[in-house]
Structure formats: C-alpha cells, structure tokens
Amino acid sequence: MTIALPPTPVFGTPVDQPPHLEVLDFLTRRRSSSAVTLAEPGPGPDEIAALIQLAARVPDHGKLSPWRFIILDSEGKAAFAAKLEALALGRGDPRAAAKLAKLKLPPVGIAVVSRAVAHEIPLWEQELSAGAVCTTLLYAAQALGYGANWITDWYAYDAQAKALLGLAEHERVAGFIFMGTPKDPPMERERPDSVALTTLWRP
C-alpha cells in the first residue's frame, strides 16, 4: 500500500496543532497484539518509510538523533532468525531457540537501536528518546491499521546476537517492533490503577 502523509512542516515555520480528539479515542483503545498472532499482510516499503519518518519526530533533547533503525523484512528477518537459532542451539539452549517464534512469525520488524553519544545531554535522556521512538513506531503502525508489539528478548541483549545485527559496541537494542495483521483482535488486559499511582505535590 502507498501511504501519503500530510506535508511535513517547513523548518522554522509555525506548526498548527489543533485538537485531535480521535487521537484520544485511539489511545483509549490502544492494545498491543501478541507477536505470534501477527500474519500477512504487513506494512510495505512505503508504509515502513512513513512509519520511520513519523517515529523520528519524537522529543530529542539536543537534537542528537541518538537512535537508528534496522528494517527486518521477510527475507532479512528469516536469515537473522536462522542465525540466532543456530547460535542458541550451538550453545545447547533450546529454550532460547523456542523464544524466536515472536521474531519468526510476524511479517516485518524494525529494530530501534539506541546509539547514545558523548554529550552534555545526559545518557538517560538519550535512552529515553530511543524509548519514545519505539512507542511512536508502535502507535503509528497501529494507527495505520496493523497489529504491533514491542519486543525485547535475549537477542536484544546478547553480544553475539547484537553483532549479527551489525551493532557497534556502544549501541543497544531499544526494542524490536514487530508488525502484521492480527489473526484475532487482541483481548483487553488488566490496566494499572492510575489514581493510586498519582500524587499531587505540595511544598
């Protein structure tokens, strides 16, 4: 599918931000789909490019872009999964190999790589920005009508797995965002009590 985003605002011009109540409706209903339920069709190349363009608009203190994207299309993802499976089985770890179903089954994935740089902007803030990229990418995919899930598993942290993905020593996987069409609508899960988690500060 070809997706046409609204024109990107021109640098230095005012950005009109009218209310979008439909966004509140979306957030009220937002629910991740289990990765193992995601099937074809998934986002095509034009849609993936648009999703990444949207995700790159997250808050980014210092304008450092302390993240990058690795697209795992069906061919690339299958090859990556095969190498991970060989790695796990070579270690005698069938449990780790079994966990690859979440990577194998969805049609497409995008790895969000945190690449924090030495800067006066604290490392924590740069990593938070990478997390915001994951969230925005997840939401944008769902707003486009796909199911999506933010996954981290052993292959997000394992040194050899990260090397297979092409990460530099200082880079970390903030998350794999897997996308596709859910076989069934996801069921609502229990949500936290936001009132109990909120306090009003007073001096």
Residue ranges and their predicted role:
Residues 187-203:
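Phosphate/diphosphate-binding glycine-rich loops and adjacent basic-rich segments that engage nucleotide
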Residues 55, 110, 116-164:
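Small-aliphatic-rich amphipathic alpha-helix that forms the alpha element of a beta-alpha
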Residues 108, 144, 173-175:
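Generic beta-strand structural signal
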Residues 100-102, 165-190:
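A glycine-rich helix N-cap at a beta->alpha junction
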Residues 1-105, 203:
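N-terminal amphipathic, basic helical "cap/leader" segment at the start of enzyme domains
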Residues 74-79, 85-86, 116-118, 159, ...:
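Short, charged/polar surface micro-motifs in flexible loops or helix N-caps
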Residues 26, 102, 109-111, 176-178, ...:
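Conserved hydrophobic/aromatic beta-strand scaffold that supports enzyme active sites
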